[in-house]
Amino acid sequence: MKQTVYIASPESQQIHVWNLNHEGALTLTQVVDVPGQVQPMVVSPDKRYLYVGVRPEFRVLAYRIAPDDGALTFAAESALPGSPTHISTDHQGQFVFVGSYNAGNVSVTRLEDGLPVGVVDVVEGLDGCHSANISPDNRTLWVPALKQDRICLFTVSDDGHLVAQDPAEVTTIEGAGPRHMVFHPNEQYAYCVNELNSSVDVWELKDPHGNIECVQTLDMMPENFSDTRWAADIHITPDGRHLYACDRTASLITVFSVSEDGSVLSKEGFQPTETQPRGFNVDHSGKYLIAAGQKSHLISVYEIVGEQGLLHEKGRYAVGQGPMWVVVNAH
């Protein structure tokens, strides 16, 4: 398995393309100059395209991915109704979902042969919309509205329209600020990192009709932490055994172990990392974690070690200015 790591650096308007080898070392293979401040990125389900959100001219760009080395070639673009904060796709590669924090909306862009062709739906009134996350069964779009302490739930119709479910939302505790999400590979649980109180919620997905329950909330910070809480990103290993979340004020990654059924998280430790880690990701082998420092302008690669999933630093690499997003593609 070959793996390519993409790092988005909006301040220098670049995507750095790296080869990740089996020992966890990175080799720079390409630097792409992007027409705008590049922030969120996602790889298409068929691994043929990288979709990128840019500003100040709000657009989604599609780059064709070379199958041999992961190099990028610009292919298409499509306008967006707000500044892109988060970007994702459905599992069949029919639609791109874009959450916009500043605009307070989530939009759906239709794809034809992998290329974005236009917005087909926009839902407004999502104050502080920070991500859009399709459920493993491709039925439900989970959309955290950070400033409203709620996660809105939509069914995605065959033509890409978003239909509010019943119930239409789940709520966090007041002041939590739900932000980013991941799903357990067993498709029974979701995990949401809350930005404003630096906690992680575990949501049990009981059935497709919206019977959803928060079964655990866990503080992700050290006991003696008294500064402003400012959590950012969350990821889970492919085997579902280890979960990670980062806080930008403390510049740390919290390590969680996950119970076998996915219902219970346990804090295992804390990894100091790059300054102001806004984005990180886990590779497809589940052996490595790559974190980007928005203020250090560096990325660090960590090996995921042992039963606890603790992190061991393997190397640091200079990237562009203000790196914010990390995506790993296997090909």
Curated annotation (Swiss-Prot):
The keyword Hydrolase applies. GO terms for molecular function: 6-phosphogluconolactonase activity. PANTHER family: 6-PHOSPHOGLUCONOLACTONASE (PTHR30344:SF1), 6-PHOSPHOGLUCONOLACTONASE-RELATED (PTHR30344). InterPro entries: 6-phosphogluconolactonase_YbhE, Cycloisomerase_2, Lactonase_7-beta_prop, N2O_reductase_N, WD40/YVTN_repeat-like_dom_sf. Pathway: Carbohydrate degradation; pentose phosphate pathway; D-ribulose 5-phosphate from D-glucose 6-phosphate (oxidative stage): step 2/3. It comes from Shigella boydii serotype 4 (strain Sb227). The gene is pgl. It catalyses: 6-phospho-D-glucono-1,5-lactone + H2O = 6-phospho-D-gluconate + H(+). It holds the Pfam family Lactonase. GO terms for biological process: glucose metabolic process; pentose-phosphate shunt, oxidative branch. Catalyzes the hydrolysis of 6-phosphogluconolactone to 6-phosphogluconate. The modification N6-acetyllysine is found at K287. This is 6-phosphogluconolactonase. Belongs to the cycloisomerase 2 family. It comes from the Bacteria. Keywords: Acetylation, Carbohydrate metabolism, Glucose metabolism, Hydrolase. The keyword Hydrolase applies. Its EC number is 3.1.1.31. It is an enzyme of class 3 (hydrolase). One of its GO terms (cellular component) is cytosol.
